[in-house]
Amino acid sequence: MFLVNSFLKGGGGGGGGGGLGGGLGNVLGGLISGAAGGGGGGGGGGGMGLGGGGGGGGTAMRILGGVISAISEAAAQYNPEPPPPRSHYSNIEANESEEERQFRKLFVQLAGDDMEVSATELMNILNKVVTRHPDLKTDGFGIDTCRSMVAVMDSDTTGKLGFEEFKYLWNNIKKWQGIYKRFDTDRSGTIGSNELPGAFEAAGFHLNQHIYSMIIRRYSDETGNMDFDNFISCLVRLDAMFRAFRSLDKNGTGQIQVNIQEWLQLTMYS
């Protein structure tokens, strides 16, 4: 399932040297550069709202209401596939390509004895790969961004990623990298505020101007430009929010009702 499954049940060093560093960088660098673009899908049902809780007016509630209203409009058009179920690395698929087999072999080396990738290990390998792409302007992936990525994909709340989870996340990053390059029309290495709506729609997120303004204030620099790591970080969080909503909307009504405990569990582990 997805992270919300565990919420409702009450839950809440790849950067090393040697042969692994070079080999892993080469293979994963090739994998990420293989993404030529593409976008997310649309589709989906009607609007949605958030029930539960009382409360008065005030600025905070008006802002929250606006955010939820915008998410309600957008989520109807975003229909992500759930992450694949966790499986042991030895269960090699018969139709796995040579590149995928090499990817799996290197994952085994990266993950170590527990066969899982931590946020720190994810950060190290992502930063190793992006250094091979000077056309992507980035300060590098920080630990908070990588913790968010792990939380989004962590189906059993171990705090780490198994092979299938890691591979699924990597495929998303490849897709989003292709979109990032395609919409960096001026080849500045960043996406400007005027380029952002098209990029997000290509990734499957149809948002209103109010949400775009909030995203720019949160993830872009003072000139309105968004670098690669912030672009990925933002998409990871959007993806998590929409997935969580759809998991909670079990009857497909477009509405959910959560209490404060469920809300905190949902928003704090993403």
Swiss-Prot record:
Where N-acetylmethionine occurs along the chain?
Answer: M1
Binding of Ca(2+) 2 occurs at D154, D156, T158, K160, E165
Q: How does it assemble?
A: Homodimer or heterodimer of a large (catalytic) and a small (regulatory) subunit. In presence of calcium, the heterodimer dissociates.
Entry's Gene Ontology cellular component terms: calpain complex; cytoplasm; cytosol; membrane; plasma membrane
* Protein name as annotated: Calpain small subunit 1
Q: Which organism is it from?
A: Rattus norvegicus (Rat)
Q: Which gene encodes it?
A: Capns1
- Key words, A-Z: Acetylation, Calcium, Cell membrane, Cytoplasm, Membrane, Metal-binding, Phosphoprotein, Repeat
Identify the domain of life. Answer: Eukaryota
Residues given in the record as Ca(2+) 1 binding sites: A111, D114, E116, E121
Q: Which GO terms describe its molecular function?
A: calcium ion binding; calcium-dependent cysteine-type endopeptidase activity; protein-containing complex binding
Q: Which InterPro entries match?
A: EF-hand-dom_pair (IPR011992), EF_Hand_1_Ca_BS (IPR018247), EF_hand_dom (IPR002048)
Q: Enumerate the transmembrane spans.
A: none
**Location of the protein in the cell:** Cytoplasm; Cell membrane
Q: Which Gene3D superfamilies match?
A: EF-hand
